[in-house]
């Protein structure tokens, strides 16, 4: 696995371009119609490593971005530099720079809402959308004065529980917790909400993001005795190096813009994504709204949903845990576009 990973990395082309007020880093492999992939929290372009290889071999240009706040892409300090307009704008910059015309956009975790809204906002640039682990919810419209999403999440959690998205809100607090031991944090994140943690009996039920009030986020991240088969020590060290480069602040700032999302996307209320769409999730993944109710709502909200699949026993890190299944399904979806 280590040799294969190194060979794959050596075949990549790295790019750093200027646009949308920042430097944007992305990697490419292969030639053909482009598929632009957006990662989530707390990850890297590297989370798409298996799909990069599969796409290139199948005759596509795999394009994996380092999202704003991560890796070699700029990491502005200002919280409002991470709202959905900025995030979608970065993907638009990359799509335009490829100079291919409309491209396919894909996303996982936080990268999924970015991909969904990119497809909604710019159908002229994105001809199809494929997302993992976070189903499409669409614009909900501006909330009434005095009501915000953080308040609704706190109300749902109750007085005795915290919620990871709320824990991430206070600047400095979450950074101190997550950055105290980045290796331990990344090892815990990548294992605790994977399907392996439940399968191995290290947790008794899937983690839905809630935990006892007063505890730290890292207290919830059970760490394995041995890494799961889909994650090597080399993989883990790459993630640690990428996060060490920037710290967690940029990634956390995505969460600190949740309250702004309804108003920013309100002009698109009632609009639908009509391009061909694709969704895959894991049956044990409850961290980001991957519930049966959300899947059902998504199926009603997408105009041309061509693939919707929940992989039994899989957790949150779908394109790594189930690399071959995800790659095969994506290839079939892409082939259907031609």
Positions of PLM-derived features:
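Flexible "cap/lid" subdomain of the alpha/beta-hydrolase fold that forms the substrate-access gate
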Residues: 3-12, 70-106, 110-306
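Short acidic-hydrophobic surface loop/beta-edge motif
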Residues: 13-19
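A short loop-to-beta-strand scaffold at the N-terminal edge of the catalytic core in hydrolase folds
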Residues: 19-28
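Conserved HGGG/HGGXW glycine-rich cap/lid loop of the alpha/beta-hydrolase fold
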Residues: 27-75, 94, 108
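Glycine-rich phosphate-binding loop signature in dinucleotide/nucleotide-binding domains
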Residues: 30, 98-101, 337
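Short, hydrophobic alpha-helix immediately C-terminal to the catalytic nucleophile
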Residues: 49, 116-120, 327, 331
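Catalytic active-site module of serine/aspartate enzymes centered on a nucleophile-bearing elbow/loop
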Residues: 305-338
